[in-house]
């Protein structure tokens, strides 16, 4: 029946979103190439049906209703495809920003992720988007932390605990020697990146 595969694809998009939001590291499951192909084939079949119904001489209520339902099915399939692609592209964007635009395909392989989970178009998108980020961060905006949080901190100074040894860190307010299990009261802006990298834990 029309729309069944599109519903499965929407469920896959929800699963992908829950998987990305529920884990510490961003992950993408295998791209559902077969489902996407079936939906595209279904859309082209619906398009042919709609064109046939539009050309019918008899424009009674029945043919108008058939045409309307066919167009609704086609639009729903397209929306489901776009929702699936948008979910995956948002996760790819987050992966690229998390790695500051470094060669993300190599990093994915090193972290145990299979880049084969991405379609060829997604691989190209991720590579080019990562290149844009690295160009931005290496140019005139080098001094600005573009990967930082967009929400302002609620507290200027925070308590942090050191999770991993990191050596001496120079900040605006002095030098901190980050030794495992030690605690500091520091300015949040100075240690935001270390928290993201897993060296510090906000208390």
Swiss-Prot record:
Keyword Nucleus among record annotations: yes
Assigned GO CC terms: CMG complex; GINS complex; nuclear replication fork
PANTHER family (UniProt xref): DNA REPLICATION COMPLEX GINS PROTEIN PSF1, PARTNER OF SLD5
Function as written in the Swiss-Prot or TrEMBL entry: The GINS complex plays an essential role in the initiation of DNA replication.
Location, primary (coarse class): nucleus
Record InterPro entries: GINS_A, GINS_bundle-like_dom_sf, GINS_Psf1, PSF1_C
CDD domains xrefs: GINS_A_psf1, GINS_B_Psf1
Example of a GO biological process term: mitotic DNA replication initiation
Protein family: Belongs to the GINS1/PSF1 family.
Highest rank taxon of the organism: Eukaryota
Subcellular location as annotated: Nucleus
Keyword Nucleus: yes
Native organism: Eremothecium gossypii (strain ATCC 10895 / CBS 109.51 / FGSC 9923 / NRRL Y-1056)
Subunit structure and binding partners: Component of the GINS complex which is a heterotetramer of SLD5, PSF1, PSF2 and PSF3.
Keywords associated with the record: DNA replication, Nucleus
Protein name (database record): DNA replication complex GINS protein PSF1
């Amino acid at each position: 029946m029309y729309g069944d595969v599109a519903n499965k694809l929407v469920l896959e998009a929800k699963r992908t979103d829950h998987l990305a939001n529920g884990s510490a590291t961003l992950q993408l499951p295998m791209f559902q190439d077969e489902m996407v192909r079936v939906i595209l084939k279904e859309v082209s079949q619906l398009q042919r049906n709609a064109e046939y119904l539009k050309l019918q001489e008899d424009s009674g209520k029945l043919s108008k209703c058939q045409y309307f339902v066919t167009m609704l099915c086609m639009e729903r399939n397209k929306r489901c495809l776009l929702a699936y692609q948008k979910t995956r592209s948002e996760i790819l964007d987050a992966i690229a920003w998390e790695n500051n635009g470094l060669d993300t395909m190599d990093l994915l392989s090193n972290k145990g992720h299979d880049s084969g989970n991405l379609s060829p178009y997604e691989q190209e998108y991720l590579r080019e988007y990562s290149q844009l980020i690295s160009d931005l961060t290496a140019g005139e905006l080098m001094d600005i932390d573009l990967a930082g949080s967009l929400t302002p901190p609620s507290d200027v100074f925070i308590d942090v605990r050191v999770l991993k040894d990191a050596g001496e860190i120079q900040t605006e307010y002095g030098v901190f020697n980050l030794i495992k299990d030690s605690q500091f009261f520091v300015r949040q802006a100075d240690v935001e990146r270390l928290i993201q990298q897993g060296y510090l834990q906000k208390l």
